Amino acid sequence: MVAEVCSMPTASTVKKPFDLRSKMGKWCHHRFPCCRGSGKSNMGTSGDHDDSFMKMLRSKMGKCCRHCFPCCRGSGTSNVGTSGDHENSFMKMLRSKMGKWCCHCFPCCRGSGKSNVGAWGDYDHSAFMEPRYHIRREDLDKLHRAAWWGKVPRKDLIVMLRDTDMNKRDKEKRTALHLASANGNSEVVQLLLDRRCQLNVLDNKKRTALIKAIQCQEDECVLMLLEHGADRNIPDEYGNTALHYAIYNEDKLMAKALLLYGADIESKNKCGLTPLLLGVHEQKQQVVKFLIKKKANLNVLDRYGRTALILAVCCGSASIVNLLLEQNVDVSSQDLSGQTAREYAVSSHHHVICELLSDYKEKQMLKISSENSNPEQDLKLTSEEESQRLKVSENSQPEKMSQEPEINKDCDREVEEEIKKHGSNPVGLPENLTNGASAGNGDDGLIPQRRSRKPENQQFPDTENEEYHSDEQNDTRKQLSEEQNTGISQDEILTNKQKQIEVAEQKMNSELSLSHKKEEDLLRENSVLQEEIAMLRLELDETKHQNQLRENKILEEIESVKEKTDKLLRAMQLNEEALTKTNI
């Protein structure tokens, strides 16, 4: 048996996974979810552990790679790289077959010791499979049958609702509202809602009637349930809300209606996916655009720590990557395994996405460099420096003005003292000369001398007065020039302040205009939504009318066929009677 496994595979065995799926799938598809299409553990369900092939595989792989086979040795610790058994012929064969076939279970076979579990096809899609109920007639009572098929007259339905409990559940915990909503019987739904049935009852998968209506894309029933107050945010057993199913179905209209009625745009399912992350993972570009417009969080993380950008890269959707990069998302964020979006793009050989990411990084670097060398900031700094200088000059000018009057006062005192000295004895002549002249010659002889001496005696005080007046004029000129300078500086300060006020007013006006625009946009969106809902109702009414006309035509044809058959039967009977009479 060992020799068979270690030998090189033939052409027929290459097409299949060399009987490992048939053996390992039963034995342990806890580690081989792709072998049987299920990630559930099947340990202990059969006696295949004693198979000779599995004993050999356990003996080889258990030592060689416990990272991939933790159940073989009872340990989940990685043993990759501890021995050289990877170059064994058995491992070469296993790498050649399983490396490409199942890197979910064999991440180390691709030359990496890191776990790749949860990187690609890790999400459970069973929630979105089989949206409609599988109904067996014998499992339903009269009310549930009428709710599912909807071919019962209104009077009979009213009688049924009087006689039985309208919130009664079947074996699968479904109410009449569940069945009517899932099959699109809007008349039955309306009748149940008018009778005030319970809206948020959960079936065996914890789904409400609203979730079933959205899952089965029954728009009219969805609108009826929302108008009557059905809860939009109740999750099912997978954690999905009604909005998750609307996004999965790419039903933008129902997603709009749910958000209009207050659905949570950031609700996560058990995989950690918000509606946006689900749309990215399923590569629903139009719905992703819609959620971005509705301001969904672009940096939210799933259970593996991955952003919307990393998911888009992993799925290989270049268009969604471009969409997200236009919104300036974080490119450098890492998931729980420490990998960025660029590393995933490089490892999966998505060259277009690599180019998009590199171009985005270059643009961001250019933006940062332009912001660092911004001329507006330099202008702001120079204006601030000028204002500080003007303030300093204003503070220094009053000090100068206060010092100048003190100097002028000192000068005035000195001049007054000198005038007093010269006024008491103007020339300093001896008293005897003046007296003698007055005795001999009288007053006439002395008067000419005094007249001639007065200009000489008073020459000094006149020159001093002139100097004083010139100093005063210079001081006044200085004061005037300084006052003019201060006036100019004050004017400049006022103009700067006015400019600042104008800029602030412009900012306020722009912010107000933006808020008004946002309000107008919201009002327009609401009006558009209401118009779309009205159009939907009109379309549904038209389709109903057309269906009724078709049904009437079919009924008329059936009646005509019945009449013809009745006539034929009567003719047959008459012929038989005639034959019997002739025979008699």
Curated annotation (Swiss-Prot):
Gene3D superfamilies noted in UniProt: Ankyrin repeat-containing domain (1.25.40.20)
ANK repeat extents: 172-201, 205-234, 238-267, 271-300, 304-333, 337-366
Pfam family, one: CCDC144C
Record's keyword annotation contains Cell membrane: yes
Tissue specificity annotation: Expressed in prostate, ovary, testis, placenta and prostate cancer cell lines. Localizes to basal and terminal prostate epithelial cells.
Bilayer topology term: Peripheral membrane protein
Chief site of localization: membrane
Compositionally biased region (Polar residues): 482-498
Keywords on record: ANK repeat, Cell membrane, Coiled coil, Membrane, Repeat
Basic and acidic residues bias spans: 377-392, 401-412, 466-481
Family the entry assigns: Belongs to the POTE family.
Name this polypeptide is given: POTE ankyrin domain family member D
Organism name: Homo sapiens (Human)
